[in-house]
Amino acid sequence: MAAVVVELRSTGQPGRLSPHSSWRLPVSSTLHSRYLSLMQLKGCGTALVTPFRQDNSIDETALRNLVAWQIESGIDFLIPCGTTGETPTLSHDEWLYVIDVTIEVAAGRVPIVAGATSNSTHDAVEKAKEVAARPGVSAILTASPYYNKPTQEGQYRHFRAIAEAVDKPLILYNVPGRTGANLEPATLARLAEVPNIAGVKEASGNMTQIAEVCNAVPEQFLVFSGDDAVTLPVIALGGVGIISVASNEIPREMAEMTRAALNNDWDTARKLHRKYLPLMQANFIESNPLPVKAVLAMMGRIEEVYRLPLLPMRRDTRSKLQKIAIEVGLIARPAGASAEANDFYIYESWLAGPHKIVLHRSNCGQCNHGKGRPAGHDANHARWHGPYTTLSDARATAQQMTGVLIRSECKCI
């Protein structure tokens, strides 16, 4: 009889289990797709970024430091080589290298859920086999096939083929905004009965669908939110936690929020959610992982380097992101900026005469409460841009604007 390895070992840390290969569960057991819950894989897991150096090579030192910081901050499990890790830009060897470094640094202190996805079922199976062979991998995260848009039956057969090929549990990843293929609740309910398929990361962005998923799958099936902003409602519906982007930046806070919700301490959970919701939302002001890597660079934890086709953030969105990072206490206010006059705005007008723009400070007395709206503002003939955290950002943006005949700065500057 085939056996599925369930890796368990006490780490001395409450709520955490780590790899061990001494306990085996027959595939035919009624617990076949439920045993991951025995590992207490719940709470907040970080979908790790992959740090790069300026020469585009993997920054192993930054990766090691990031993994260590995550664990020291109380994160419950780690996911290397997912969407946030820019995995499509990694070579095959680099993909395994990132997973191996994460396993080595974690040293059994938290479970490792390794990403292994392909739009070819054959390749997805081979990748899953490679990571399943690593003793430090507790489970595999695998997304719906992207680009080729399989039917529901095609997705079912794809995931079942992977599950039947490996002896590690699978967490399925439904992210139709990326893959172009939505994994519907009825299909997921069928997959929940397949040996080795133990849970799902639900990132459909559709709360009605997530509610249907929670109702359709068995109680022991693990449902994770794939979106930080809806962690609490997903847990309220029966979910077991979050596979998080924001925990790259705020691991302790995301772990505390998630544990509070799981322990029915909703006052604490809501308090943390209210404070960090702007950051959770700002992490998607441009394509993930651009904002989260930008914030980590602002924090001094990584270099802000992406691989093509990804490019650094635009100045306007970076400025908004920086402002939020300051407000939630992740980074210090820029030198020389005061709390009363931290932001700058560009006011663009074409009501009369030449098209023109004027730079204003946020506390300018000539503007409407410093929002770049001088008296007599006409929304049909004017608009404002910003805020910009630094004057240099505002000036650079103004310089790049086209079709503007006159540029000037208010006396408040």
Predicted regions and their residues:
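Ala/Thr-enriched low-complexity intrinsically disordered regions
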Residues: 2-3, 11, 30
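Short, low-complexity intrinsically disordered segments enriched in A/P/G/S/L with frequent Arg
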Residues: 8, 17-19, 26-29, 33
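Active-site beta->alpha loop and helix N-cap motifs at the rims of alpha/beta catalytic domains
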Residues: 35-46, 51-180
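C-terminal alpha-helical cap/extension of soluble enzyme domains
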Residues: 36, 40, 45-51, 73-75, ...
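Residues at the N-termini of beta-strands
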Residues: 77, 139, 199, 241, ...
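Short helix-capping segments at alpha-helix termini
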Residues: 104-110, 134-136, 166-168, 193-196, ...
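Catalytic alpha/beta core domains of metabolic enzymes, predominantly
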Residues: 164-165, 178-284
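Mature, structured domains enriched in cysteine- and short glycine motifs
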Residues: 335-413
